[in-house]
């Protein structure tokens, strides 16, 4: 398969029958035929960390509404399950090996040069805005492709943050989720009488804990990390318990399938590491942290509700495509892990991808085919009738939303990769890997330690507790997956 074919897979062959075909050539048509587009990115949100996703006590009626009235992608994956790299994957449609935002170090200069899809939307006639977390460098100034820009330095702060808006950085009193929602609403309201469609990228600080991250990617250990819910939500879930029946009770039990995880945990639990990092080590495993995260998400859900109400009041809800996603998942003790969100296990790589657009998407759809975060960019460009450049490595998922003969299965596997540094968490310093995830299997290749590669049958072992790579019966399967992984890697680095 040549590169152009592999980029598009089947998207181009059914363009006339897919959703994107509705708006192809729309620049010559009436402006209202092109949808307004809202992308909401929730930081660190697990694929199951909202009501409709299966959370046992968190109530998220507005996020659930997107799922109920739109499509849920049940096998969407993060191309690199880590903050900065995956944000670049989402915005460029490229793998990390191509866009080169490898980790959370300060990539300010490089991030000014990224070929992002909002630039193409802007060229095609959209008014574009970014509100919230850029997090590809600590430079808060505007990046190319956005007419409106409100952001902050690096991780930002939860309470009384410094926001860069109107050309300067200034401290603004309030809770960051509410402040970002207010600015998103302001942008949307200013477009009410515009003849141009708009695109808004709303990237929340939540549900990431408060933290200070230096230019080299390391955290300010004296400051620590803190989950802080809006005052009105604190204590809402104080008596709730997250069920642990499907989570290993100890780190040792959780690491049984992986020699690499056992190595990571041995370093993490070393006396010197505990002494240096303190309470940063295990926020995801603490019951209170899981409650605090749930309470933080409540303000995100309320903000989404306010936006939905504004769109309904203006009569634009039906003409607005809304995408909700995250940059990576998180561990609640699975495999004995918590903050090691970059590792290639299901809790971290699965993406809570929802899309609502009633003009073209049937309510309550569930798409079980594999989708990657690099597919978001070409999907939005196709939806907008804009050009999908050859630099984009993802493929539009719109063909998966078509019906009948137009519907196609796009890919049989996805690539997941990580390039570790790692100053924030030195116990995973050698966690560089490339992994292939199919409908049924996952093969993990540890770049520095191939002798510890892993294979899981996700149908019989969904919690990835039994590494079966050395079982003789799997020899042929391992060789096939290695070959397929090699092809994906070749595509990821191709020009």
Task: Describe the residue ranges of each PLM region.
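Formylglycine-dependent sulfatase
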Residues: 2-447, 451-454, 462-483, 487-495
């Amino acid at each position: 398969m040549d590169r152009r074919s592999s980029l598009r897979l089947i998207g181009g062959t059914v363009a006339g029958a897919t959703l994107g075909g509705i708006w192809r050539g729309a620049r010559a048509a009436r402006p209202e035929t092109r949808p307004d587009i809202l992308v909401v990115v929730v930081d660190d949100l697990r694929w199951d960390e909202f009501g409709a996703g299966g959370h046992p006590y968190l109530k998220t009626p507005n996020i659930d509404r997107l799922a109920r009235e739109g499509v849920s992608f049940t096998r969407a994956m993060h191309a690199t399950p880590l903050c900065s790299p995956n944000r670049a994957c989402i915005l460029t449609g490229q793998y990390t090996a191509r866009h080169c935002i490898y980790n959370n170090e300060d990539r300010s200069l490089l991030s000014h040069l990224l070929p992002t899809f909002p630039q193409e939307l802007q060229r095609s006639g959209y008014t574009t805005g970014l509100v919230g977390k850029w997090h590809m460098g600590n430079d808060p100034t505007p990046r190319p492709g956005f007419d409106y820009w409100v952001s902050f330095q690096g991780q930002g702060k939860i309470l009384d943050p410094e926001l860069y808006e109107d050309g300067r950085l200034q401290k603004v009193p309030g809770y960051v989720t509410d402040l970002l929602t207010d600015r998103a609403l302001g942008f949307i309201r200013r477009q009410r009488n515009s003849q141009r469609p708009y695109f808004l990228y709303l990237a929340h600080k939540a549900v990431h804990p408060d933290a200070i991250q230096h230019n080299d990617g390391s955290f300010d250990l004296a400051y620590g990390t803190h989950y802080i819910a809006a005052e009105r939500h604190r204590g809402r879930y104080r008596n709730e318990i997250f069920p642990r029946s499907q989570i290993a009770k100890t780190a040792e039990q959780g690491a049984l399938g992986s020699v690499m995880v056992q190595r990571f945990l041995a370093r993490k639990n070393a006396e010197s590491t505990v002494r240096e990092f303190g309470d940063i080590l295990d926020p995801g495993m603490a019951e209170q942290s899981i409650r605090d995260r749930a309470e933080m998400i409540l303000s995100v859900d309320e903000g989404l509700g306010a936006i939905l109400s504004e769109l309904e009041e203006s009569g634009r809800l039906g003409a607005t495509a809304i995408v909700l996603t995250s940059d990576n998942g998180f561990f609640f003790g699975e495999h004995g892990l918590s903050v090691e969100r970059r590792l290639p296990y299901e809790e971290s790589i699965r993406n809570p991808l929802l899309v609502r657009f009633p003009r073209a998407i049937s309510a309550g759809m569930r798409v079980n085919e594999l989708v990657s975060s690099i597919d978001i960019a070409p999907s939005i460009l196709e939806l907008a009738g804009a050009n999908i450049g050859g630099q984009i490595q993802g493929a539009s998922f719109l063909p998966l939303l078509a019906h009948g003969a137009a519907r196609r299965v796009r890919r049989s596997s996805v690539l997941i990769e990580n390039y570790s540094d790692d100053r924030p968490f030195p116990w995973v310093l050698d966690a560089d890997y490339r992994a292939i995830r199919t409908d049924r299997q996952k093969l993990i290749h540890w770049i520095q330690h191939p002798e510890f590669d892993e294979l899981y049958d996700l149908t019989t072992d969904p919690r990835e507790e039994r590494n079966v790579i050395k079982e003789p019966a799997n020899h042929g399967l391992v060789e096939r997956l290695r070959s397929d992984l090699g092809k994906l890697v070749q595509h990821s680095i191709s020009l």
